[in-house]
């Protein structure tokens, strides 16, 4: 079957061709005992990064994967795909996130992902992503990020969020607003198809890199938007407090 001509592929053939011709390139460095950590750019301590991971289900055909993105430019700077235990994966994630300027660390919290998250929390990594317990990201949930009873560690992929996550990656690819450099990710994207209305890997192929990339782009948009709204809200609250404080001081001077 010619997937490019079938009309069932999630990502348009012309967009795939654009990315392959414009951005795809070999990594500058292959790291790790298995050589599966591909690095295109080293850390720049003036930048903010996010590390977004998908934990293997544990079967023989599944992989654990993560991407590192420059948050500001949506540029893929590193990528991992390999076979590794959930606990060891947690240690790898803490190490690489710490290396990349204490990056925001996002790990899907479904099923076996909890074992990885528990290891990250045991290592006391401070910049772990939390999701709202009601699965709805709002300014209020962002402002409550330190009230852990209102949040759950990791990213919650659900029947509601999965289509939104994939739609966000489709949008980024269509608008050419993300820089993807990985041949491995491109290969997954070419066999990512619509099947009974659901986007998924073709039989006998994987989508680990796609899902971690899509999650990164979704969280990037959500986190940046909520951070800005939260900052605006905080400034408004501070301004209101300062005005109230000034009025109170004026009243006290009058009374005095």
Which positions does each model-derived feature cover?
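Surface-exposed intrinsically disordered loops and tails
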Residues: 141-153
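RNase H-like, metal-dependent nuclease domains and their acidic two-metal-ion catalytic environment used
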Residues: 1-133, 139-140, 159, 163-167, ...
